[in-house]
Amino acid sequence: FMEDNNILAVVLAGGKSKRFGQDKNQIKLGDKTLLDHVLSKISSRFEEILIVSSHSVDIKKMKNITIIPDCFDDLGPLAGVLSAMKWLKENHKRYQWVATFPSDTPFFETSIIEEYKKKIKLKDSLLYFIKSNNKKHNIFGVWSIELLKQLEDDLINNNFRKVEDWANKIGVKTIDIEPKKFDPFFNINTKEDLEKAKKILKEKYNDQI
């Protein structure tokens, strides 16, 4: 476990899968659901994991995982982050940071968690996102809970919806990750994406993931 247990892991699993036509979390890639791929990567690296979802989530019961509803269904990922922060406060948790992971991106490398730990020690920003191949990955980030009030205000009163717009307003810093032969941040939105992911699983991982 992390020696400095001040980060809560949050899996944002709330997005309605309009393009997929079914609940993406339960789609199988190899012998695991997309959500299980993500959970198996992070479960041993965090003391506690929160899943934010606007529909029921079917996972094997694990003692360090809590599932909560998205308190603003359909307002996008910012609302999921806010739901997590509010839960954290209401339950008097001591975590100072929230690390977010999307539930539809099974190939990310767990080394990013070490990067988060390094960055939050610097304390030169309240928000960091991963950047790879010149692309910012707005759902792979670590957020200070000091942002709660402002996030709530901007979401409810100022109609912020896009993660990027809000992050730019806050002054996000990026964590640059070396590019790989394939994109570890490839996310699955469509049935075509799922076929691509199956290829990646075979070619890069020999189905071992």
Predicted feature descriptions by range:
Residues 207-209:
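Short, flexible loop/turn segments with low-complexity composition
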